[in-house]
Amino acid sequence: TGRKFSATSLGKPQYITIKYKENNLKCLIDTGSTVNMTSKNIFDLPIQNTSTFIHTSNGPLIVNKSIIIPSKILFPTTNEFLLHPFSENYDLLLGRKLLAEAKATISYRDQEVTLYNNKYKLIEGIATHEQSHFQNVNMIPDTMLRQPNKISPILESDLYRLEHLNNEEKQRLCALLQKYHDIQYHEGDKLTFTNQTKHTINTKHNLPLYSKYSYPQAYEQEVESQIQDMLNQGIIRTSNSPYNSPIWVVPKKQDASGKQKFRIVIDYRKLNEITVGDRHPIPNMDEILGKLGRCNYFTTIDLAKGFHQIEMDPESVSKTAFSTKHGHYEYLRMPFGLKNAPATFQRCMNDILRPLLNKHCLVYLDDIIVFSTSLDEHLQSLGLVFEKLAKANLKLQLDKCEFLKQETTFLGHVLTPDGIKPNPEKIEAIQKYPIPTKPKEIKAFLGLTGYYRKFIPNFADIAKPMTKCLKKNMKIDTTNPEYDSAFKKLKYLISEDPILKVPDFTKKFTLTTDASDVALGAVLSQDGHPLSYISRTLNEHEINYSTIEKELLAIVWATKTFRHYLLGRHFEISSDHQPLSWLYRMKDPNSKLTRWRVKLSEFDFDIKYIKGKENCVADALSRIKLEETYLSEQTQHSAEEDNSDLIFITERPLNTFNRQVIFSKGPPDIKVTKYFKKHITQIFYDIMTREKAEQYLIDHFCGKKSALYIESDADFEVIQAAHKLAINTKYTKILRSTILLKNITTYAEFKELILTAHEKLLHPGIQKTTKLFGETYYFPNSQLLIQNIINECSICNLAKTEHRNTDMPTKTTPKPEHCREKFMIDIYSSEGKHYVSCIDIYSKFATLEEIKTKDWIECKNALMRIFNQLGKPKLLKADRDGAFSSLALKRWLESEEVELQLNTTKTGVADIERLHKTINEKIRIIKTSDDEETKLSKMETVLNIYNHKTKHDTTGQTPAHIFLYAGQPILDTQQNKENKINKINNDRVEYEVDTRYRKGPLQKGKLENPFKPTKNVEQTDSDHYKITNRNRITHYYKTQFKKRKKNNQLSISQAPGT
């Protein structure tokens, strides 16, 4: 079927002229038309096939051709124009969508039109009644829509699902819809919202969550286009929020022009994990169904982008933040995917329709149904509902509404004038179960029915004709009356009461799913009793899915089928595929799995692993291979949404894959190299054509799991298009990597590179060195090798101390939400000089200001210099040093509107103490350096490396990136924080005293380290060291300073390339 549009406008045409080459094109302005048209292909562009229905006052019109006018030819944006001779006087018809994108304004006073910030003179055309040749595409006056005695041709279309009505019903319904035309939403209209209810996100803590996915460069223009549309609609705004949820770009079906469409999805799973559940009661389905019995008319109503018509609470707006490559945004309307969104929608509709509930209509989550016994009563009820929705400023999606139905499906039941009937789809999978013809099929069927044998009296006797066919050398005769009778009776028994029960919404639901090589199966149950069985076959693309993809597809399909039972309730999913039990903990799922995880985020469930032998019901349903005539609509729907012909993007560097294909511009050539155990193919090309791309895919990808790298997005689109043809051959997954690192070929080169960087950055630790190396270079087993190299660094062994934690229990404290909210200060002394040290807690940006003495006046002057450089914080935290506890300093800070918070006695300020320890280490390292210039400016060197060149473990960014350049920290999730805390507390119990520290009673101090570190270390000869600590000299043998070797270290002989 093609697309269906309407075209309406004012009775008198008006047009503008736009210059194209040497011609002045007459462009008709039609604010009522949802399509653009051109009388002829004056642009010499390729003609596209389409099937578009235009409804005019002269009747329906089908247009089969269109052209796509690229950007900058006529307008800054790309637009589709239907190719049809709609008029002899005009060249183009500009519809509502194009006018909206162009931010068009029409000034009748000045007689001009503004499009894309360009002004055009508005010219009055020929009146409608005088123009015989004009085909009335745009000649349906707006006034006609308001006349109750005339029917708009828009409403006569089957687009609005009115084909089942007789003439009287259609006439009266159309009159009602014309009366309430203001609540109808059409594509391109600005979406309104209600202020009846606001959605609030209450979280367990106020720690900002930050996570981000990268999306392909090829999607960037589409993403920004949709972002701009939502900004224009007022759905989102730009944001400064510390929160960030990742976005995912999901491909949709192509439009009639063949252009690929996409949908932006926000992954709110992390936010949902810390969101407090909304306990708003969900209506009892039995009570709702009880009120719908024996009605003659039913209407189901769908709100246009329902969630986006509800306003967000201002206090919760910041928590909905997300980011693209070009900006940070937050929702002003309720987005899809939030945990409590269904409950808020239910509350909102209850408040709006409360006077009408149970009498004229019912609401269940996002389903609204109007019911009555007669046509007059039903139209009256619809009018009352429309009136309430209009007052609440809500809009309807008419093409998704069903009006005046005498039989409809609602909440899994079929509503008819004769009463409520169970949905036949609940047992369709059982009724269509084919008669077993092989022993394996008999076992599967008896496993399905035998699962409920405790509810079937004399099960063994009934099943005997089938069980005896399992004996050795026993022939299976499906025409045997006893065999056929046993099969049919068992199917009947498990499809009827007392086995198949009516759902009890006070009890927990269990959804059991399974997938085989050919089909999917699922059963919804409570307390062991089945409520509904479903199964379907896999389409030609789904058969190629991996096992975990098929298993997850079964869950996605089943939750969609049983959505009216499961949405808004906690339930359990049982699966015999164990990897699904840690679905949300996968670190690198592919695009399909990630997209399906996002789809499941609106449900509240736990995944439970069960053994395969316990999953006999869903397993049997998943092994039914139905004939083509039995394929359900859901199967076809899955086929429509399938995108297995797409090459997905991965964040993994190309170098990590065993089979790598690199496309580069240059004289045509192909080079194949080996890098350790990895196979690398480098393809040089001058122009990427469809034919070349197909040959490359067949020669280098088919039958081989590979990853490719290509810089040009335009050339990648050619490969993507050719991939659809190559997919029919023996196929395995292809990924596109956007990261290509430089390969290091030998261990000697690798070690030299690590040592150089390690020394240049003042000897950072293992993790920081590994991250720094991994941003640019690749070498197999680099992490273990870097650990080995750094552990053998003599300067690190001498200058650094172990970072042990105090033995007090660690607890999370409220984190600041932005820079300059909270500073920590302390006095730092080194080599006879004193400094006021300061660190911004949010960004970890640090600075030092030298002072002559440690009194409050010097500290005040130092703080003034710090405030001039960094700005004033809201809160200043310090220990109880005499200068900081001074009443005079406190009063000065109060006058500056800065709150001073002092720690309790004998406790340090953790972040600032850790900074001091880092500075001490770096200074000791600098002292061992031969660079005299560095020694003279050591404090400046340390601060420069700390602030600008070292990524902090907590934020994942350099302090300067966040503090000076408004970058966003990459914060850990609450679960990761709790895991780290538990590990720290466990390590305190199990650690051993390092021999680098003096043996004796443990001495606790302000530092995180509970031991007193050495103050001054000197090497007396090749085997001995002298330690001076508080004027006490102790001699040690050199082995006491060496780090213990880790069990998992690689020796040089094990390293690649040696």
Swiss-Prot record:
CDD domains in the cross-refs: RNase_HI_RT_Ty3 (cd09274), RT_LTR (cd01647)
Gene3D superfamilies for this protein: 1.10.340.70, 3.30.70.270, Acid Proteases (2.40.70.10), HIV Type 1 Reverse Transcriptase, subunit A, domain 1 (3.10.10.10), Ribonuclease H-like superfamily/Ribonuclease H (3.30.420.10)
InterPro entries reported in the protein's UniProt record: DNA/RNA_pol_sf (IPR043502), Integrase_cat-core (IPR001584), Integrase_H2C2 (IPR041588), Peptidase_aspartic_dom_sf (IPR021109), Retrovirus_Pol_polyprotein (IPR050951), Rev_trsase/Diguanyl_cyclase (IPR043128), RNaseH-like_sf (IPR012337), RNaseH_sf (IPR036397)
Pfam families: Integrase_H2C2, RT_RNaseH, RVT_1
GO biological process, one term: proteolysis
Keyword presence, Nuclease: yes
Chain ranges of the Reverse transcriptase domain: 231-415
Enzyme Commission no: 3.4.23.-, 2.7.7.49
Swiss-Prot/TrEMBL keywords: Aspartyl protease, Endonuclease, Hydrolase, Nuclease, Nucleotidyltransferase, Protease, RNA-directed DNA polymerase, Transferase, Transposable element
An example molecular function term from Gene Ontology annotations: endonuclease activity
The Integrase catalytic domain, residue ranges: 810-967
A Gene Ontology cellular-component term: DNA polymerase complex
Catalytic residues identified in the record: D30 (for protease activity)
Keyword Nuclease: yes
Catalysed reactions listed for this entry: DNA(n) + a 2'-deoxyribonucleoside 5'-triphosphate = DNA(n+1) + diphosphate
Additional notes on this entry: The open reading frame is located in a copia-like transposable element called 17.6.
Protein name: Retrovirus-related Pol polyprotein from transposon 17.6
Annotated organism of origin: Drosophila melanogaster
